C-alpha cells in the first residue's frame, strides 16, 4: 500500500505542474460588426481558449480611440485600420504599434441613399453631400480612393462631411443630414429597416483588395510575448477556416 501511494504522488505532482494558466489578453476592436465574423466565431467556438488565451473584448468606436487604448496599455492588442500603425511610427513613438495579422482585405461599408437606386454609379455623388468618415481613417481613404478611380475629385466634385463621430453617421442621416451616407453593418441594414435609407453600392466590391483591418500590438509586447501573439493568430486562423468552410 505504501509503495502504491509513493508511485501515485509524483504523477499527481507532475500533472499539477503542467497545468497551464490561461494568458489574459484585452483586445480593443474598432467597431462591432458582422464584417468581423471570423473573429467572433473564434471567440464563441472557444478557439482562443484552446490556444491558452483568456480574451476580453472591448469596442473602441473608432481607430483613434482603439490606438489610444493600445498605446496607453488599456489594451494588449488593437484591431483597426492598418493605417493607424503607420501614424504611430511616423509620429515618432518609440514603442510604436506593429501589425501582425490581417482579417479583412476589402472595404466593409456601403453607400446608402435616401431613395432606391437600381443602377447606381459613383458619378451620382457629384454635387451631393455625403456623410463620410474620419479624415485619415481607412474607411474615408478607401472611399476617396474609389472616387478617384471613377475620375471624381473628393475635394471639388462633392461635399464630404467628416465632422460626425464614427458610429453616429447613421443617426445623423436619419435626422436629415446628407444626401448619402457611408455605413458599416449593422447600421446600413438598420437604416433600410426603418425606411430611412437604401443600400445602393458596396465599397468592398468597388475598392478591390486593400489591407483594410488588421491586428496590432506595441513593439515591446510582441517582443516580450511572442507565444501569445502566435497563439492569438492561431485562434484567429481557426475562426477564418471555420467561416470559409
Model-derived features with residue positions:
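Sec-dependent N-terminal signal peptides
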Residues: 1-3
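C-terminal motif of bacterial Sec signal peptides marking the signal peptidase cleavage site
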Residues: 7-11
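Basic/polar N-terminal segments that are highly enriched at the extreme N-terminus
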Residues: 12-20
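Extended ligand-binding regions for polar small-molecule ligands
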Residues: 14, 45-50, 215-245
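Short, glycine-/small- and polar/acidic-enriched structural segments
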Residues: 19-165, 172, 179-186, 196, ...
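Short, catalytically relevant binding-site loops at active-site mouths
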Residues: 187-188, 205-207, 221-222, 239
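Short helix- or helix-capping micro-motifs
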Residues: 191
